[in-house]
Amino acid sequence: MQEAGRMQLGPAPIPTTNTISDKKTIAIGADHGGYEMKTALIEYIRELGYEVFDCGTSGKEAVDYPDFALAVAEQVISGRAWRGIMIDGAGIGSCMVANKVPGIRAAMAYDYASAANSREHNNANYLTLGAGLIGINQAKLIVKTWLTTEFGGGRHQKRVDKIMGVEKRFLKEG
């Protein structure tokens, strides 16, 4: 796994396809609270036909979610992963971390509707889940919905462009 602190922030291309392989790769990570759910989801995501890149953690020992949320985001913005999924206790903290990374549009989903909306309306490329808030069956439904829902474009594209404009406006070179 890459060290999270080595990432250079700056304008990054937003990949629309996987640049390493024709098969779509999903980067996935978790803290200790999401480890068991991550393990189950890796198998499920592979069953759906995707490649999986595991960004850690590798056990239930207490770790800091920002490190793993950033590692997943790095895979997405570099183009090594098509999309990213991060699981922590509530899904909120990891979503906040990921949305600090230029080019990431992270959404926390807790049901079918929020997963579909995040893709169709907001073109989210990063999903966060709260292992303490949802069970594995709900998580599988959310992940499948999120991975298979296409961006709606049209009137939503203008709004996503505005999100990107806000990002550019406040982006500071490091």
Task: List where the protein language model places each region.
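C-terminal binding/interaction regions
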Residues: 2-13, 21-29, 33-34, 112-174
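Glycine-rich phosphate/diphosphate-binding loop of Rossmann-like nucleotide-binding domains
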Residues: 27-52
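Residues that form or flank phosphate/diphosphate-binding pockets in enzymes
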Residues: 36-37, 63, 93, 137
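Alpha-helical segments flanking ligand/cofactor-binding loops in enzyme cores
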Residues: 43, 70, 74, 96, ...
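Short, structured coil segments at secondary-structure junctions
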Residues: 48, 101-102, 122
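A short beta-strand-loop structural module common to alpha/beta enzyme folds
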Residues: 51-62
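Helix-adjacent hinge/juxtasegments
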Residues: 68-108
